[in-house]
């Protein structure tokens, strides 16, 4: 079973890998700001630099600060669902996107009036993460990265003069053994938190709620089958992961189950495939909210385990709790975005 063994070895750091973005590849050659915004992203770093930066970011990403957001999550979820039109409600555009972007904005300390800009930048930048990127999308991503970088620098400068109880202030103040994050590193972290946090949450909500509706299970059956909202969230993100693969390069000659992978080989870690491995999960294509094995791959693993998993879990638990109370039904079969790496729908039309 190459997939599961490879995943297991990656998570336990037995397979030495690096990311294509760690060195400037041809993909970034003409796009200075996109490269600049990715250069110190935790997703792209390895070794001591990754360890140092992740440690500093983790100190700023305080569990208590995340927990303090729960009342805001509850309020925002109820507000958006109260506004819904019973005959024309797009769960992605009218709920998931404004819900997710408002929470990331609240965490970072971004004014609500700027959330629409954040949403636009995120949509444009993440298109660069797929296999097929056309010139127009690449140019749009470059401009979005430049605008985002300039905006974040301005906000960071203001926080140094006027500190707040927000993530940007904490990132600017955190230190370890007299080591601090540079402005460039902080801005890359802000961009990562938006793109990874927002896009993943939106697509998990869309993929997951479609799964709930298509399963034909009632809210009562789902509640009876699961012991907690966390059970529901973990099963939905396993069943249809928002991130389907991650690309890396092998740093040393490696062997997995007698399969030789030469140094320098490009490998794709297929997270969605590992999550549907029948040798690991019983009836993997079925939604089972009482599943004992919750060891899926959607949060990543090892040194690259999702640093915002605690925030994402809370966002999703609050959302699905309120969505399940709505007794919504599917109004039209949704269309996939067509992207391979980041998996989601263009829309998800639901109603009473």
What are these regions (language model features)?
Residues 1-352:
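Cytochrome P450
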